[in-house]
């Protein structure tokens, strides 16, 4: 089974941190586009297969950006939060996002969650009919 490269948007104000996280995703040949804040977003989230949003952005909190997204977009979003387990569970359940990961995020852990998202989205679309694909 192979999964084609998926387009990822990473919204993260810290250039060094987003670079570390993106390197691991790029190793799996997923093209990653960057934005640093909610005010400078010049993208259409519908054009991406996965969106990763940090809690601290230029121009405001990442949670404000999540509230701007439609439910459809939030379902394909990973949110990076320093909140405790209860806070992260609240974000994930109330906003119906795919995953809320605890910061600091290890690049490999982010890659695993992204891979899980891609595989589950293929299953949900009925694209993996057999294991021989």
Where does each model-flagged region fall?
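C-terminal output helix
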Residues: 105-114, 126
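Conserved phosphotransfer microenvironments
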Residues: 18, 39, 52-73, 85
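Conserved active-site segment of CheY-like receiver
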Residues: 13, 80-85, 104
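Two-component/phosphorelay signaling modules centered on CheY-like receiver
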Residues: 14-33
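The C-terminal output helix
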Residues: 115-131
């Amino acid at each position: 089974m192979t999964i084609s490269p998926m387009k990822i948007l990473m919204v993260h104000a810290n250039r060094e941190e987003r670079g570390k996280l993106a390197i691991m995703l790029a190793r799996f040949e997923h093209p990653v586009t960057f934005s640093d804040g909610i005010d400078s977003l010049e993208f259409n989230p519908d054009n991406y297969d996965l969106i990763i949003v940090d809690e601290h952005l230029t121009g405001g909190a990442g949670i404000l950006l999540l509230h701007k997204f439609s439910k459809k977009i939030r379902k394909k979003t990973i949110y990076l939060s320093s909140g405790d387990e209860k806070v992260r569970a609240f974000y994930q359940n109330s906003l119906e996002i795919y995953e809320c990961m605890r910061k600091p995020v290890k690049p490999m852990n982010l890659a695993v969650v992204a891979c899980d998202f891609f595989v589950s989205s293929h299953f949900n679309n009925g694209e993996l009919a057999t294991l021989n694909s």
